[in-house]
């Protein structure tokens, strides 16, 4: 490193990019990784300013997507909307969203002079590091999807997470934009005096949602005065049309609003959205109301970035498939594995609702661990409405380092006939054996078990490496 210290800034950047590109190619060749984070780590070791330099030298517009849930899918939707209009996109498509992963996008896409040719540089960034990463990227736009309980040992309580996001938003200059979920009271209140232009998205649709928040909802008190919020309509968890009886604060006027939602025969959703660019009719080929929110976020971001053409949006998402681990359907021999990444009560409950809408009794493999990546505080599992699953449950295998706690939670939910198998490969094989041919096995997994299951499936030839999708 002493020799590198005396190297000119331009040569240091070129060396960092070359080393990063080489490490990514080697990893893919040896099948030990897809170059989604290691190239960024190598490049940053040589030149800590590599991301900042590449971002500054690139002419494309730069967008950052952050928040608790929906980042990866929203990014893919926004990329599809841009590409439908002939706009080239560079993104961390595999969802590697820490600094190493974000830097790996720059390493992969830039030439050795440090310039990216893409017209839109689209970066999903973890909510805990966005305040550090955003200044390096200098984005034209930051979008915040939502704030839910997620890894409380890592983030602290919800307001700590909000402050992390707020720091990034406050640093945006006046010519930039911030796109916020207006249906999330905590997100909508972020950095009210920030100079950046503000746009809000959300739902304004009848026929969906409820009148009161579900019992595991996170933010149901006013951010200003802490009075319990009153809801005209709740669409998901604590997201909805709210007003505070105490101080009168309410949901902001929505710039992009989903006004009509209809289930489609393919399991997706047909939506109508009102936007400043006009009415948009669009088919969302992914299930669930949470994907309607992701679509609203993508539309708002596309308008903000100048990449929204209502006429092209209708079929822009037609080729979209679930991101890996998002109700991802995988052919596992003569059975179907449905892999779902669940990490907090909201994502878990939303996934369970989707599973329960499908016919037949359910065969389930639930796997959770408590590594630093997964989050060491697992108490949130007790707020998941697992009771709704029990009447339809045909078989259950639990796995991971927290298998015993999952088993205990299921016993309290009323289901005791389960297998506890800590090892992931044995658990997968047992769960598949308990699933009749032609029927689906639903895999509900935290981050580390999900990656482990996919590695097993990759070795068996059931899925390609995630970086090739």
Question: What would you call each of these model-derived segments?
Answer:
Residues 60, 144, 148-335:
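Acidic, Mg2+-coordinating active-site environments of NTP-dependent enzymes
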């Amino acid at each position: 490193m002493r020799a590198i210290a005396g190297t000119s800034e331009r040569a240091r950047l070129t060396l960092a990019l070359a080393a990063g590109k080489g490490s990514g190619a080697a990893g893919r060749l040896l099948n030990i990784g897809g170059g989604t984070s290691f190239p960024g780590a190598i490049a940053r070791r040589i030149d800590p300013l590599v991301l900042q330099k590449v971002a500054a030298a690139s002419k494309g517009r730069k967008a950052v997507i952050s928040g608790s849930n929906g980042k990866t899918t929203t990014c893919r939707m926004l990329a599809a909307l841009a590409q439908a209009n002939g706009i080239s996109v560079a993104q961390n498509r595999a969802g590697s969203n820490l600094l190493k992963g974000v830097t790996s996008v720059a390493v992969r896409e830039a030439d050795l002079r440090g310039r990216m040719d893409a017209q839109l540089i689209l970066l999903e960034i973890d909510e805990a590091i966005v305040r550090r990463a955003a200044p390096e990227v200098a984005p034209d736009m930051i979008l915040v999807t939502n704030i839910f309980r997620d890894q409380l040992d890592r983030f602290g309580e919800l307001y700590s997470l909000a402050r992390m996001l707020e720091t990034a938003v406050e640093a945006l200059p006046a010519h930039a934009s911030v796109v916020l979920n207006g249906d999330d009271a905590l997100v909508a209140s972020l950095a009210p005096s920030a100079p950046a232009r503000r746009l809000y998205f959300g739902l304004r649709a009848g026929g969906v949602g409820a009148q009161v928040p579900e019992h595991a909802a996170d933010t149901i008190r006013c951010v200003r005065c802490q009075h319990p919020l009153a809801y005209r309509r709740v669409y998901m968890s604590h997201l909805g049309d709210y007003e505070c009886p105490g101080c009168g604060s309410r949901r902001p006027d929505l710039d992009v609003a989903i006004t009509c939602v209809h289930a489609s025969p393919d399991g997706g959703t047909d939506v109508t959205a009102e936007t400043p660019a006009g009415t948009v009719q669009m088919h969302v080929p992914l299930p669930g109301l949470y994907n309607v929110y992701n679509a609203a976020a993508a539309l708002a971001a596309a308008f903000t970035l100048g990449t929204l053409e209502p006429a092209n949006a209708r079929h822009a998402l037609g080729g979209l498939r679930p991101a890996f681990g998002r109700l991802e359907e995988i052919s596992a021999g003569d059975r179907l594995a449905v892999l779902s990444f669940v990490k907090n009560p909201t994502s878990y409950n939303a996934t369970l609702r989707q599973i329960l809408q499908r016919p037949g009794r359910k065969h389930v493999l639930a796997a959770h661990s408590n590594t630093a990546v997964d989050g060491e505080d697992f108490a949130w599992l007790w707020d998941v409405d697992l009771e709704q699953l029990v009447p339809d449950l045909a078989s259950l295998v639990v796995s991971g380092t927290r298998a015993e706690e999952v088993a205990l939670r299921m016993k309290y939910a009323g289901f005791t006939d389960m297998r506890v198998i800590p090892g992931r490969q044995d658990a997968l094989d047992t769960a598949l054996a308990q699933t009749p041919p032609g029927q689906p096995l639903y895999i509900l997994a935290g981050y580390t078990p999900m990656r482990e299951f996919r590695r097993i499936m990759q070795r068996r030839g059931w899925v390609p490496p995630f970086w090739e999708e």
